[in-house]
């Protein structure tokens, strides 16, 4: 994975497992924001609640960048 810092433009090239460890708090914050957004949608009542986490990680690139409040963003996976 290649991550970039929005402020300093620093680049990190790390494997997914290291990303999960190093950015655990940012991932959790992004997931909570994603979860709140999805649960507030009217159509969510028709979906399976167990799929929330699966859907978040399935589109991790987009969700981390748009729901996370981190100075880092995923440039490439």
Where are the predicted features?
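A short beta-strand micro-motif
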Residues: 1-6
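Glycine-centered tight beta-turn/hairpin loop motif at sheet-sheet or coil-to-beta transitions
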Residues: 7-9, 51
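A short, exposed loop/beta-hairpin motif centered on an aromatic-Gly-Thr core
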Residues: 10-14
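Acidic, low-complexity, intrinsically disordered interaction modules
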Residues: 16-77
């Amino acid at each position: 994975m290649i991550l970039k810092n929005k402020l300093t433009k620093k680049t990190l090239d790390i494997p997914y497992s290291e990303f999960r460890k190093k950015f655990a708090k940012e991932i959790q914050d992004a997931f909570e924001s994603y979860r709140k957004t999805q649960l507030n949608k009217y159509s969510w009542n028709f979906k399976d609640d167990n799929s929330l986490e699966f859907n978040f990680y399935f589109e991790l690139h987009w969700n981390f960048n748009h729901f996370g409040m981190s100075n880092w963003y995923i440039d490439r996976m």
